[in-house]
Structure formats: C-alpha cells, structure tokens
Amino acid sequence: MAQGHGDAKGTTAHTEAGGGHKAPFPPFQQETFASQLVSLAIAFVALYLIVSKIALPRVGGVIEERQKTIDGDLAAAQKLKGEADDALKAYEAELADARARAQAIGAETREKLNAQAEAERKTLEQRLAAKLADAEKTIATTRTAAMGNVRNIASDAASAIVQQLAGVTPDSKAVDSAVDASLKG
C-alpha cells in the first residue's frame, strides 16, 4: 500500500559535493565576468535607447504641452486682466461723466428755479405794491370822507355846545372856520 519516504527505489541522495568546496556564485565567476560586462553594457545601451527614444520624448511632450497650456492660460489671464482694466477705466470715465452731467443739470435746475422764484417774487411785489397803492387810495378816500363827516359832526357839535352854553345860535361860517382851524392844527 503506502511506501515510506526513506526507501524509494532508484533514488540516491546528493548530500555531498565532490572536491570538498562549494561552487562560487555565478555572477562572481571570473570565467564569465567579461561576458557579463558585455551583457550589462548591451542592457544599458538598450535601456538608454528605449528611454531616450521612447519614454523621454513622451515625458518631454507632456511637459512641453503643460508649459504651452500654462503659457496660454497666463496669456489669456493677462488679456482678460487688460480687458477688465479697460472696462474699469471706461466705467470710471462714464461715472465721472455722469457725475459732471448730474452736477450740470443740478446747477441748471437751481438757476431756473432761482430765476422762476425771482420772477414770481417780482410779480408778487408788483401785485402787493398795486394793492397797497389801492389800499392807500381807499384809506385816503375813506379818511377824506371821514374827515368830511368829522368836520360836519364837529361843526354841528360846536354849534350845539355854543348854543347851549351861550344860549345864542352861532354863525355857521364862524363855526366852520373854527373847526377847520382846529382840525389843521
């Protein structure tokens, strides 16, 4: 059935090496050293060619493309900054122009309102002067009429007083001249 591990037929144990020492590590064997250097040189040349002809141009292309993109972005940013600066200058110029126009409109409006107010003031002064002149005429007329009535009343009162005090009826011309003299003076 099952056989043991130790007694396999046709196998021999290789536990000992002939000659008494071990073989050196193959890369350090002096007989193969020259061929190893040639193989190393060929491998480095092949690696150098692969890197310089395939990998480095790709990396260089990527770096160059990135630099172009960065330069393009910087140029676009400078252009946009210039446009923004121009727009800001135009805005400030428009704002200054609008302020100047607003001040001019304000000054013009003030002048118009002042002229209109002055014209209305003069018209009002003329109307008030005319009303004052009419009122003075009315007062003078009323005063003259009142003084005429006062003169008549004073003459009648003086005649009545003289008549009551003296018992004599005075002359109307003498009473009128006495009343006129007292009113004048």
Swiss-Prot record:
GO cellular component, one term: proton-transporting ATP synthase complex
Subunit structure: F-type ATPases have 2 components, F(1) - the catalytic core - and F(0) - the membrane proton channel. F(1) has five subunits: alpha(3), beta(3), gamma(1), delta(1), epsilon(1). F(0) has three main subunits: a(1), b(2) and c(10-14). The alpha and beta chains form an alternating ring which encloses part of the gamma chain. F(1) is attached to F(0) by a central stalk formed by the gamma and epsilon chains, while a peripheral stalk is formed by the delta and b chains.
PANTHER family in UniProt: ATP SYNTHASE SUBUNIT B, ATP SYNTHASE SUBUNIT B', CHLOROPLASTIC
Topology class, membrane: Single-pass membrane protein
Single GO MF descriptor: proton-transporting ATPase activity, rotational mechanism
Keyword Aminoacyl-tRNA synthetase assigned: no
Protein localization: Cell inner membrane
Signal peptide: none
Protein name, as recorded: ATP synthase subunit b 2
TM annotation in the entry: 37-57
Region Disordered, residue ranges: 1-26
Keywords recorded for this protein, A-Z: ATP synthesis, Cell inner membrane, Cell membrane, CF(0), Hydrogen ion transport, Ion transport, Membrane, Transmembrane, Transmembrane helix, Transport
Family named by the database record: Belongs to the ATPase B chain family.
Organism: Rhodopseudomonas palustris (strain TIE-1)
CDD domains: ATP-synt_Fo_b (cd06503)
Function according to Swiss-Prot or TrEMBL: F(1)F(0) ATP synthase produces ATP from ADP in the presence of a proton or sodium gradient. F-type ATPases consist of two structural domains, F(1) containing the extramembraneous catalytic core and F(0) containing the membrane proton channel, linked together by a central stalk and a peripheral stalk. During catalysis, ATP synthesis in the catalytic domain of F(1) is coupled via a rotary mechanism of the central stalk subunits to proton translocation.
Coiled-coil segments on the chain, per record: none
